[in-house]
Structure formats: structure tokens, C-alpha cells
Amino acid sequence: MAHKIRFGSHILPGLIFLIGCLGLLWGITNVARGATSDALFDLEAKLLKFETFNRTTAATTLDGTTARDLEACDTHSQRALLLLEIPLADAALRSGAVQEFDLRSGALETRAQQTLSCAPRDSLVWLLLFGLKNEHGLLDERTFDLLKMSYETSPNEAWIAVRRVVVAVPTILSAPEAVRELVLAEFQALVRRGFVETPALAYFSASPQVRSMLQSRLDQLDASERAGFTRAVEKLKS
């Protein structure tokens, strides 16, 4: 069991960013105890806008009757529940609650697989599965196939790219060459398009070797494209 805690400390912060909790305190917004499918659809939209939710009410929603009885192909609701479960797994990891962590991460993987059986082009869920495998220390070719699927199912969508860069960049040294190129190209494209905050975070947190690889892509941009990125990195230093 202990190996999960060790590996998890490297990847779950990236998964946490999928729901916008990075650098934020948990909000006071509550999810209704008797959540319906329509309410979960609305919840998904809020989470994808980086709104945050109270842990207790998140757990109540996940453990409630609606979550248990939800149809596997109600993909928006399933995704909302996935997004709610990630920070609960992180909280268990940080507190050393190994049994709860195993329970939460197992539930995440099961729900993700169910969602993909109905929505095989859900790039966010492919990314989540990649993160979970990484969290367990499984950075093999099959794991990177999951990340590749996330890229292939949303090659030019900023909403997923700004999340994916935070999860993918820390693994770049282990990635096959083709996947490494996808990671670097998306990092560069985000900066070029002015989406600088998450690439800056990935750059700021990177090892010297990874940072050098990212810098080589930054050097290909013109000064005006790099300016916003430089300011974003400086903010992280302050």
C-alpha cells in the first residue's frame, strides 16, 4: 500500500487542478443532498469553470442514492462525480488514510471506465485515467496511450489543454517520443494563444532538464508571445 502514497504525491496535485482546486481554499458552495441528474449536469459546468465545493457535501453527493443509481451513460453527471471524487482522494492521500485513498481511487477508475464505455471520445476522462495510472507509478507505454487518447480526442480545445499541460509536463522524460512531442507542442501552442497561467505553472514546477525542453519551445516564439508567459512565471516567484 505504501508505494501508492509515494507515487501519489507526484501526480494528484495535477489531477486536483482538473477541478480548479490548485492554490485555492475549498469554497463554501454546497451541493444539495438530494442531487438530481439535472443538478449534477449544472455541477459539472461549475466545476469545469474552476469553482470549488465543500468536501463534506462532495462526499455526501458521492455516497448518496443518486450517485449510486446513476445510469452509466449519463455522462455529464458521471463526469461531475469524477470531478468531485478527485479532491477526496487527494485529502485521503495527504492525511495518510490509505484505506479511504484506495477506495476513492478505485471508485474513480471504475467510474471513468464506465464513462468511456458510453463516451469514448471524452478527453477529460482519458486524462484522468492517465493521471490515476501515473499516480500508481505505472508510466509504461499503455499508460501513455491513455494520454495520447486525450490529445487525439481534443487536439485543439483550450478548456482541456490548460488542464492537460499541468498533468502531462511532469511525465515528459518518461514519455515515448511521439507523446513527448504532443506535450511540448501543446505547451507552446497555449503560450502562443495567450493561455499562459497553466503553462507557467508547469514550467515553474519543472526539473531543470524538463524546463530546458520547455524553454526550447519558448525560444521559438516571438517576444510579444513570450511576454505574458514571463509575467505569469514572475507572479509565481513572488
Predicted features along the sequence, with ranges:
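Short, Lys/Arg-rich N-terminal segment immediately upstream of the first membrane anchor
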Residues: 1-9
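Hydrophobic membrane-insertion alpha-helices, especially the h-region
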Residues: 9-31
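Short, flexible segments with low predicted structural confidence
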Residues: 11-15, 96-97, 121-122
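Alpha-helical repeat scaffolds
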Residues: 20-24, 58-67, 100-115, 141-151, ...
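Amphipathic alpha-helical repeat scaffolds of TPR domains
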Residues: 33-50, 69-95, 119-132, 158-169, ...
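Alpha-helical solenoid scaffolds that mediate protein-protein interactions
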Residues: 43-72, 108, 115, 150, ...
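Non-cytosolic head/periplasmic domains of membrane-anchored proteins
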Residues: 98-169, 175
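Extracytoplasmic/periplasmic C-terminal soluble domains
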Residues: 149-238
